[in-house]
Regions:
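Alpha-helical scaffold segments that form or flank carboxylate-/histidine-based iron centers
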Residues: 50-63, 90
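Helix-loop junctions and short alpha-helical segments
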Residues: 60-61, 68, 72-164
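Polyanionic, low-complexity intrinsically disordered segments
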Residues: 6-40, 148-246
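A broad, structural surface signal
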Residues: 62-70, 74, 200, 204-207, ...
């Protein structure tokens, strides 16, 4: 019956959503555990070892921040690409993404005249093809995932970046500037009593980015002509596997 078909469609959508949620969760669990183990090691370390471990947890926190954002973004696009739907069934940004990498190659003069003509024709055709692949260079953390870079990644994913802008001081100064100083062998003094808040904050930002993508999938805000949902997606609540923070 029509009712049963509708119920099956809803269940199918939940299964697809939860499968992506489970992937996100798996990649988060081991990162959270490593940070938790490092915090425990710092608290029980002897005085000479503590400064080394404090510097290490800054580098580790940044590494997990960068790695998790990149993983979530790539898995999100893989999730959409597996549908092999026409570009016209997705929000405009999906089609824009398909052109961006090719435009970069065009700008750098690495393509033939034939390929340049093809790029222009593809743009003029308005997305007649299917979305089945994302240029991996687009989700580029630049080994320097500061506020401006995460905003670019949010643009590629077509999600709101305001929350990260509001945390610019934490990302760019308390995390990234310190990480860069440590990576270049400079002295950087970290206080033991700030580690709990720092780790909780980075896990919160990782979880926030994950939720932005999960909510888009659950509400199908990635679909064409779904602008109302996209305006509400930031307030949507994920129905599966809520993130627990340390």
């Amino acid at each position: 019956t029509e009712k049963n078909l509708g119920q099956r469609a809803i269940l199918s959508n939940i299964r697809k959503y939860c499968s992506l949620t489970q992937v996100f969760q798996v990649f988060l669990i081991w990162r959270r555990k490593q940070l938790s183990d490092m915090k425990a090691a710092i608290k029980t370390a002897d005085l000479p070892s503590k400064p080394v471990l404090l510097r290490a947890i800054i580098a580790m926190s940044y590494a997990h921040w960068e790695g998790y954002v990149r993983t979530c973004a790539n898995r999100y696009f893989e999730h959409l690409a597996l549908r092999k739907k026409p570009f016209v069934e997705f929000e405009r940004q999906i089609y824009v993404n398909s052109i961006l990498g090719r435009l970069d190659a065009l700008y750098r003069g690495r393509v033939s005249l034939e390929e340049r003509c093809k790029i222009i024709n593809d743009i003029l055709d308005g997305g007649d093809g299917r979305f089945s692949y994302l240029n991996p260079d687009l989700v580029d953390t630049r080994s320097n995932l500061n506020t401006d870079v995460i905003k670019d990644i949010c643009m590629i994913c077509d999600v709101d970046s305001n929350h990260f802008e509001q945390n610019r001081t934490f990302l760019d100064i308390l995390l990234l500037k310190r990480r860069n100083a440590i990576a270049h062998g400079q002295q950087e003094y970290i206080q033991t009593d700030e580690i709990d808040d720092l780790v909780a904050k980075i896990l919160s930002l990782m979880g926030f980015f994950r939720n932005l993508l999960e909510n888009k999938v659950y509400t199908k805000a990635y679909a064409a002509n779904n602008s109302l949902v996209r305006t509400l997606v930031g307030a949507a609540q994920a129905p599966c596997d809520p993130i627990a923070h340390d």
